[in-house]
Amino acid sequence: MKKLWIVGLILVFVWAACGKKAEEKAEEAAPVLPGVTAGMMSTLTQFGSALDKKDFAAAYSSLRAVLQDFWGLSPLLLQNVRFVKNENNTFGIYEPRETEEYAPGDAIYLYMEPVGYASKKSESGKYEIGFSADMSIENDKGEVLGGQKDFAKMAFSSWNFGTEMCLTFTYTVSGLEKGRYKIVTTVRDAGSDKTATCEKWFSII
């Protein structure tokens, strides 16, 4: 009887040790991606599974879902800020201006691509997006020469959760002497409390 008890104790010990090793292996196998939420990780797993099955439509949908989650986490960002030749632009389709020099009275067109804005679904089923903006002009000493709050307000709607959005602001300034100046533009997201500011230098010749 004593011998059986010893064998039983050894079996229990081995079983417990195996269980512990299995738990350690499970912990080691768990992917570690700092900042990635559980929901995003689940969707990324779905993406990988769909890709492995060559179900590219499902994989694309999963990627879009991750991007939508990222959009909610991200602050408002202003990407690809540049001077362009006119105000008629769409996302990624514009004519870059080769120079940042302007004659007095020239219209200045500034293109940018916002990221992380709110996109809220309305009762109609459309996603509603909106922005407002303030602007100011500074000289090379940092002195504010003028500006305007809410100089632009824009609203958009789409049947899809849109992530390819561009804004083009038109600035008409007068009374500036020859020299170097800075346009400071603050964009506010209408659907949240997110804001972002960009600065762009130009010269009057």
Segments and roles (model prediction):
Residues 4-13:
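Sec-dependent N-terminal signal peptides
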Residues 15-17:
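C-terminal motif of bacterial Sec signal peptides marking the signal peptidase cleavage site
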Residues 19-21:
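Bacterial signal peptide processing site
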Residues 29-205:
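Intrinsically disordered, low-complexity terminal regions enriched in Ser/Thr/Pro/Gly
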